[in-house]
Amino acid sequence: MPLSPDPYSALRHAAKYVQQFRRKTFVVKLGGAMLSDPRLRRAACEQIALLWTFSIRPVVVHGGGPELDTLCDALHLPVEKVAGRRVTSAPVLDAAKMVLAGKLHTDLLADLQAAGVPAVGLSGVDAGLIKARKRPPVMVTEAGATEGKLVDYGLVGDIEQVDTRVVEHLRSADYVPVIAPLSGGTDGAVYNTNADTVAAALAVALSAEKLFFLVQVPGLLKNVSDPSSLVTLANLTDLATMESTGAIAGGMKPKAHAIRHALVGGVGSVHLVSGVQPNALLEEVFTNEGSGTMVVRENAQKPAGAVG
């Protein structure tokens, strides 16, 4: 958070947000690329710890794509993604279990504990938290393509139901749930499910005040190669425009879908925030200016840096 010439003024300013968000639910999704860097992972955990200290109720969801890619390479398994989403064979699913519910998950829990957060790890399989069905083959038109193609994503689950009872039980005892993006089928199958999708579904089911995506860039960018083209405020119409112009592509497309699902489902706002810039999450929560992009269903006024 930027230093103020008058630190007491900064504290008074932040205090109104502390009061406003007290006991509110924030779902925080940590990107896999950031989690692969222990320094960035610990910095994120320290920010989450401060939210918890201020009686904000965080629920953490994590990805793990880069570490899964690394393990697949080591195991000589193909890494295939279409429109930003992973194709998951049975061997790749086994690797995903090792990473998402294993090493990465445990390392994140350890760092949260070290930061003072009473974190408890779950996957979507635990207590039937995330119920899914296998995604059927779908037609996908990738960026730059003129025609779509039929894609079978393999053992990927589309969410059908979210049962938040285990999460609510943990939160009632002042624990912080940390959720890996695996889901369970009614037939006992386990599926790989996009972490952005899981975060949005949980945010809706928990009636979250806010959903945060911590990413490698400052937020939504009008020009993906220009960090200074940050969009500070956007609505769903703006989001659709950025998708149509190609400003949102690749791995950002699942995020756009998740943002839309969350906002239509009643989440107050969705924020894309840097997981690299120091204290960007805290700055987004506790200052007027914020640090990244806030997306809402509709906005009447747009400050400088907004779309349009």
From Swiss-Prot:
Keyword DNA damage: no
Single GO term (MF): acetylglutamate kinase activity
Pfam family, one: AA_kinase
UniProt-listed Enzyme Commission number(s): 2.7.2.8
Residues where substrate binds: G64, G65, R86, N192
Gene Ontology biological process: arginine biosynthetic process via ornithine; L-arginine biosynthetic process
Coiled-coil regions listed: none
Pathway: Amino-acid biosynthesis; L-arginine biosynthesis; N(2)-acetyl-L-ornithine from L-glutamate: step 2/4
Site note Transition state stabilizer, residues: K29, K255
Stored HAMAP family: ArgB (MF_00082)
Protein name: Acetylglutamate kinase
Species of the source: Myxococcus xanthus (strain DK1622)
